[in-house]
């Protein structure tokens, strides 16, 4: 069974976790010029993009 030989410091574990982040969805410009979230239906035109 694998057991760590030394304690991992807070800064080292935080450096490893820097890539665990949430990316926000960027709005997409629709044909009528409004911005909306991707994979959603535009209520005015009814377009799904």
From Swiss-Prot:
> One GO BP annotation here?
translation
Q: What is the lineage of its organism?
A: Bacteria, Pseudomonadati, Campylobacterota, Epsilonproteobacteria, Campylobacterales
Which controlled-vocabulary keywords does the entry list? Answer: Ribonucleoprotein, Ribosomal protein
Among SUPFAM superfamilies, the record links this protein to: Zn-binding ribosomal proteins
Cystine crosslinks: none
User: Which gene is the coding source of this polypeptide chain?
Assistant: rpmF
Q: What is this protein called?
A: Large ribosomal subunit protein bL32
Record's GO cellular component terms = large ribosomal subunit
- In which organism is this protein found? Sulfurimonas denitrificans (strain ATCC 33889 / DSM 1251) (Thiomicrospira denitrificans (strain ATCC 33889 / DSM 1251))
Task: Supply one GO molecular-function term.
Answer: structural constituent of ribosome
Entry superkingdom: Bacteria
């Amino acid at each position: 069974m694998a057991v760590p030989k030394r304690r991992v410091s807070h800064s080292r574990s935080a450096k490893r976790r820097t890539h665990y982040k949430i990316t926000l969805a960027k709005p997409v410009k629709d044909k009528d010029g409004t911005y909306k979230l991707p994979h959603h239906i535009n209520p005015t035109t009814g377009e799904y993009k």
